[in-house]
């Protein structure tokens, strides 16, 4: 199962806290802190989600408005047939999913790929800045509307 959400700039710090488990006081009661050590950061490059997000926004044009959807997040849950599979096999599924999403939306636009094993169902949080090339202005720009079209969503599971 996969779920997409478009987020404004204002939502990014809160998402980063959740994705990277930067607090000990979780509002989500489903989080089992004894399993948090199992979580995986598939973008372990030494920086955090917020830094990667801000760095990518500095590289592309983004309108300075509060309502601009500057970040898109996919949540991909582990398929039922893999729930009893070994950790390594589950991990391989999430790595393959991350590679698929990087190919689809551009690895340079990815700002987070975190697997949570400490909640009820293991799942991947994949966050990226939706970027397209603006032919009129000859530059990259943020546009969730142009990246995440109905056609993109319809062909996602193919």
Tell me the role of every PLM-derived stretch:
Residues 1-158:
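N-terminal nicking endonuclease/strand-transfer module with a His-rich metal-binding environment
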């Amino acid at each position: 199962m996969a779920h997409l959400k478009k987020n404004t700039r204002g939502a990014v710090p809160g998402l980063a806290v959740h994705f990277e488990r930067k607090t000990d006081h979780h509002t989500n009661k489903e989080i089992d802190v004894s399993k948090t050590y199992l979580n995986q950061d598939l973008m372990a490059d030494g920086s955090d989600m917020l830094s990667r997000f801000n760095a990518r926004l500095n590289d592309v044009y983004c309108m300075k408005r509060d309502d601009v959807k500057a970040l898109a997040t996919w949540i991909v849950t582990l398929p039922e047939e893999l729930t009893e599979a070994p950790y390594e096999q589950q991990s391989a599924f999430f790595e393959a999913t991350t590679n698929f999403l990087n190919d689809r939306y551009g690895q340079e636009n990815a700002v987070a790929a975190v697997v949570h094993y400490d909640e009820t169902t293991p799942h991947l949080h994949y966050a990226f800045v939706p970027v397209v090339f603006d032919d009129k202005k000859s530059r990259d720009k943020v546009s969730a509307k142009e990246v995440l079209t109905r056609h993109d969503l319809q062909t996602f599971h193919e």
